[in-house]
Amino acid sequence: MLVVGSKRIGVQADMPLEDVTLDNADMLILPGGLGGVKGISESAHAMQLIREAYAKGIRISAICAAPTILAKAGLLKGKKCVCYPDMLEELEKAGAVVCADSAVVCDGLFITAKAAGASEEFAFAIIETLKSKAAALNVKESICAR
């Protein structure tokens, strides 16, 4: 199954969303982009998976407009987070503590990032969360990151 994003980049999916379970999940990573975010938000199965992941203590990362999915799921009340600047009001309405000046925010089970420009920092936060700070630093150094 080929999924094509808003920038016309195709990604081969391992399986259809309907077949996804959380049996071996360490983290859900929600991609940004308005079209994809709209699609995820309108999918009852995706929203159920996200709520179930949270209930099971599975970490969830979201970048760009994707933190609004977490807001729609009712999961951000009192949580520190960030998203694409044009979408911050949606997070505030959901009771989130918006950190508009941050590129990446980690709070509890959530890692949120502002936009594609924060993707390096977002990736390192994910590595640090799933592995270790040392692993994140090792990757950062090996790719000559900023």
Where are the regions a protein language model picked out?
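Extended, subdomain-level signal for the structured scaffold at the beginning of enzyme domains
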Residues: 1-60, 68-72, 77-78, 90-101, ...
